[in-house]
Each structure stands twice: as structure tokens, then as C-alpha cells.
Amino acid sequence: MYGIFYAPEKLQIRRKDREKKKYLVSHTWIVKTPLPLISGQSYININKKTKKNSNIWEFRILPETSNTSLNTAMHTMVKNGQQTPVLLGSKIEPRDSTSIKSLVNEPNTPTDMYHPKIKTEYDMTIKKESPTSTEPLKETTKDTSKDTPKETLICKWSHCYREFQQAELLYHHLCQEHVGRKSQKNLQLKCQWDNCTSKTEKRDHMTSHLRVHVPLKPFACSTCSKRFKRPQDLKKHLKIHLSDLGIDAPKKKRGPKVGSKRVNSKSFHKVSYDQVPAIGSASQPRFNHYAPMQASQPVSYEHWVQMEMPHYTPVYSPALAERVQAISAPTLYVQGFENREPVVAATQFFTRLSTNMAYQVPNIQNQHLYVPNYVGRPDNLYLHSTAHSSDNSVKTSSSSSPIETSVPTTHHTDNKRSPLPAIHYVPQSNIPLVHSHVQPHYSANEVRPLPSLSSISMVTPKYVIDQNLPKYNRTYDTFSTNQKSCADEEEEIYDSDVSDDEISDMMNKVNLSDKNANEEEYDSDEEDFIATFKRVNILKDYAICTLLEEEYDTEDEPEPVLQPNVAESKSFDAHLMTFPEILI
């Protein structure tokens, strides 16, 4: 493939590079054609002594080049669809004995060809390249599929074309500079975005309308991670999760506006929140007098927030989870709140409770694992020898109490298993199993041989124990001379005083069904925890959206306005404030 490239008529030499003496002028390809046309690489030689603003060109003739003029190269300058050969270079002297003609494969190819489809605008980029490079010029057409930059957002407001990399910056630019404020005398309530002609009566309505033009979705659902432009949209989305939990959202019923005199006092209980202690405070009382009725009696969201929530701490507990499950679905509108304090308190409470429960989610499975109380001895014991004397190896005590048959239970705290008891090793005698004339040598990591049979008694008394060794984790067996015979097991069972009911009770204690019942109980607890966690997230999102809606309602409150003069007010024309642009 061949093609036409563009080169400027004049290129000023403004700096010198001492390491690399040449700059490659990378041309932009215009038309690709199978016919051989002018193509190649052009180098600017700055190694020679030149005057200021002088142009010295050196052209490297490549095999694709069709011009064969002696010591002269010619570019075809293309303008307005016409081909006119223009001499852009001067005569040059080859630096070596290699002739320029020897690099040409097709000496008789015409220099100008007619191509009707040619662009009229051209670009040129300058790139550094090694002077010894002999490769032909590659296509410099930009590939949009590689290294695609981030999507640039352009402000389409009237006579404004500023670019932004983030939707938040564009939205802030629209609200501050184009919509303005009443106190700054530049409030604009008519949308001028592209062809939009929407009009609003309040500033918060206009800022809410701008979210239609800006891809801004700051409100995310904690359950499914979907994002929305407005808190009202998120509150409507919460109805889906309420139905998934088996809760029917109440029908929308428009109530009196916040602060209205027509608020029904029977719909909520008036509480003085100045007397209620802060959430999480040390002096916060417990809600014990409500405990008997909380298990079954449902409660509305507004009543629970105002009456019961101040008596809880935002930490997960079974009692709090049971009461949260009894809260009915919140309404999708603000009703029953005279001030913002309960809304702010509910937002803080459910946010902290959700954070507290989120830390426990990874530990749910480990928390409800079935762990038996009895910890047996390990199967594989690696016995290491320690320097014990024969006097301290086994101790007898006449006043020692009988061996306890009860197995100590382990108490699990913080959802972690208690560590295993320490393992005590077999006492070793100093007599090795080697020849008496050979001195044994043992390395530090080598397992030493067991003591000889003559050093340990074969018959051990019944109550001789090692005081340092746990009874339920013995590393060796002990024997007694007072053992009972097990020849007639049936006679011993029938002769005993144990009844059939006691035997059945003993068998039920070792039945595996208890383990399955415990696992089912733990699974149900895990399901209850997850259901409570989802409900808490829904209540948290609802409280946040309610608070943001109130913020939007109070955003357009009357602001102090400077009274202008009468003469100036007649000729006053509200214009947008602009900032000077700095060109670098």
C-alpha cells in the first residue's frame, strides 16, 4: 500500500538536540492507494551550522519513493483536491558513498497521480527517532480503539462549552455558575441546556431538573447496589425489597406538609427530645419495661423511632433484632415528624447498626459451627525428649483425690474456639537402648530412643497420676491391678440397679440427632441475622432519603438580599458570573 502524506512548506528550527541530531517529521496519511506515490520519511538536519530561522532539509529516499532527481527530493503538496509538485527541499550532499539512486526500485514511476477524494485539512506531529533508522514510515492514523480516554462531559448550556471529566464537577458547575443564587442576583430558573426550555419556580426544582441532563446517580441502594438520581427514586425502589421480605408497603397517602397546623396529633406521640440521652451514651437506660411486649406486638416506623429507639444502642443483639423485625414497612412520604431531630437520630442509629452488623457478616458461618464440648487428645503425637530427671518423672501422692470422671467443658467467647490444652510429653529415662561401651550422640532435631523397659514399672497403681498432665489428654496409658473382669457383660447389666428409662436417657444423650438439631438451630439463627441485616439496610436508606428530601425542601429558604438602587434596578440585567480563562 502506498499513500499521500502532508508536509509543511516551512518549518523553523528553534532548538538543538545534542544527543539526537535529527527529528522525524511524521506525516498524516491522507489517501491509501495501491499505486506508488510520493511517500517516505523526512529528517531535519540540525547538525550543520545554520543561520537563525533558516530551513535546511534532508530527505531520505525509500524504495517506495518515485522521485529520482539527483540529490533532490520532491514532495507532492496537495491542496483543495489538486496535485501540484512543489519543491520543498534544497540540494543535499550524501554523507556516505551510498547513492540515493541505488535506494530506488522503480525509477520510471510518474510523480503525480489524480485522486479525487482528498481531504483539505491536514495534521502534523513531530516525533523523535534514532538517525540510523531505515524503516519506512508507518501509518500515523489514530486508532480510537486503543488508549481511549475517559468520557469527556461537555456543558451544553447556552454559550458554554467547558469540558469536565466527572459528572459531579459538571453538576457543581451548573448549579453554581449557571443556576446561581438569589443572594448573588444571578438566579436562573429557566433551563438553557441545549434545546431544553423547562421553567421552574424554585431553585431546588431547577437543580433537581439538571440531573436529567447530567449522568449523575449519587444515591445507591445498600441491598442491590443500584444507583439513582434522586432520593425519591430510591425510596420508590425500596418497595421492591420490602416485598421480597414479605412486607407490603402501605399505600401512598398524602399527609400535611412539615410544619403545618393540620398535623393530626393522634398519628404520633409528642416527645421532648431534649430529655432523651444521645445514642450510645454511657448514661443511656435500657429498655427493659418494653421487653415483654416487644416479641409479638408490631409497631409503626414513626412510633418506634420516636418512642423506643432512644432506649437502644446501635449494636446487634437478639432482642434488638427481634424488635426490628416487628417494625412495619415505612411510608414513602414524610408524616408524623414535627422537626428534623428524630429523622437525624434515625439516620445515625441505623447507619451505625448497619456498620456493626456488616463486621459480623464474614463470621456468620464460623459463629454457628457445631463445636463439641469435649476436646479429645490428638491422634498424631510427635514425642520429643526433654531433660527430665527420674525423680521428677512420676510423682505419687497419698493425699491425692480420686480421678475426676467429668470432662471439663470449654467456654467459647467472641465466637472463637478455646485453645487446646498443653501437651505434656512422656518422661524419659537416662538409660539409652545402645551398647554400654558406645557413647551415643544425638542431634538437636533428632528423635531420641524410648527408655528401656526396665526403667518403667509395668504395673502402675490406680491413682498414681502426673500432676502436670491433664486427665483428659493423657499421652500414655496407665494400668491398675484392681481391674474388673468383662467376661459376663449381660449378667452385670441385669444385676445392676439401672432402670430401662435411665438407659434410654443415656442413649439419647449420645444420639446424633442432637447435633443435627443444633445445626438446624444455628442455620435458622443465620437466616434471621441476614433478614435483620437486610431490613436494617432498608430502614437506613429510607432514613437517609427522608433526610435529604428535607434538605432539598429547606434549600430554597429566603436568603438576605441586598436592596439595589432604584436607578440601577430598572437597568439591571441578571447575567451569569464568569471567570477569566488562563491560556498557557
From Swiss-Prot:
- An individual GO BP term: positive regulation of transcription by RNA polymerase II
Q: Does the keyword Zinc-finger apply?
A: yes
Any Gene Ontology CC annotation:
cytoplasm
Q: Name the InterPro entries for this protein.
A: pacC/RIM101, Znf_C2H2_sf, Znf_C2H2_type
Alphabetized GO MF terms: DNA binding; zinc ion binding
The PTM entry states: Activated by C-terminal proteolytic cleavage by signaling protease (probably palB/RIM13) at neutral to alkaline ambient pH.
Q: Which UniProt keywords apply?
A: Activator, Cytoplasm, DNA-binding, Metal-binding, Nucleus, Repeat, Repressor, Transcription, Transcription regulation, Zinc, Zinc-finger
Cell location: Cytoplasm; Nucleus
The protein's superkingdom reads Eukaryota
Checking SMART domains in the record gives: ZnF_C2H2
Note the PROSITE patterns from the entry: ZINC_FINGER_C2H2_1, ZINC_FINGER_C2H2_2
Please note every region of biased composition (Low complexity): 389-410
Zinc fingers, C2H2-type, are found at 153-178, 189-213, 219-241
Keyword Nucleus attached: yes
Segment Disordered: which positions?
A: 385-422
What is this protein's function per UniProt? Transcription factor that mediates regulation of both acid- and alkaline-expressed genes in response to ambient pH. At alkaline ambient pH, activates transcription of alkaline-expressed genes (including RIM101 itself) and represses transcription of acid-expressed genes.
Per its UniProt record, what PANTHER family does this chain match?
Answer: PH-RESPONSE TRANSCRIPTION FACTOR PACC/RIM101, PH-RESPONSE TRANSCRIPTION FACTOR PACC_RIM101
- Family, per the entry? Belongs to the pacC/RIM101 family.
Its recorded name reads pH-response transcription factor pacC/RIM101
Q: Which organism is it from?
A: Candida glabrata (strain ATCC 2001 / BCRC 20586 / JCM 3761 / NBRC 0622 / NRRL Y-65 / CBS 138)
> What high-level taxonomic lineage is stated for the organism?
Eukaryota, Fungi, Dikarya, Ascomycota, Saccharomycotina
Quick one: which gene encodes this? RIM101
